Amino acid sequence: MAIKRGTLVRAIREKLEGSLEAQASDPFIPNYVFETPGEVVDIKGDYLQIKFGAVPTPTVWLRADQVQEMAG
């Protein structure tokens, strides 16, 4: 199934850590990125803009292959 706006996703640690996207930002990736669901709020090509968690945090752009759709 294709990921679309509103889809809940979770980051895949093995694909995100050490990636170009991770190197372009703070090297410490907070656990909430891997442990909480994120909502896809925009899509541009192979990249997804994702809002993680219920607390106010900035959105992040990740490649579609760095996340997995959550069941449910």
UniProtKB/Swiss-Prot annotation:
Keywords of this entry: Membrane, NAD, NADP, Plastoquinone, Quinone, Thylakoid, Translocase, Transport
GO molecular function, one term: quinone binding
Compartment(s) of residence: Cellular thylakoid membrane
Pfam family, one: NdhO
Superkingdom, taxonomy of origin: Bacteria
Catalytic activity: a plastoquinone + NADH + (n+1) H(+)(in) = a plastoquinol + NAD(+) + n H(+)(out); a plastoquinone + NADPH + (n+1) H(+)(in) = a plastoquinol + NADP(+) + n H(+)(out)
Role description: NDH-1 shuttles electrons from an unknown electron donor, via FMN and iron-sulfur (Fe-S) centers, to quinones in the respiratory and/or the photosynthetic chain. The immediate electron acceptor for the enzyme in this species is believed to be plastoquinone. Couples the redox reaction to proton translocation, and thus conserves the redox energy in a proton gradient. Cyanobacterial NDH-1 also plays a role in inorganic carbon-concentration.
Subunit structure: NDH-1 can be composed of about 15 different subunits; different subcomplexes with different compositions have been identified which probably have different functions.
Similarity field: Belongs to the complex I NdhO subunit family.
Official protein name in the record: NAD(P)H-quinone oxidoreductase subunit O
Primary gene name: ndhO
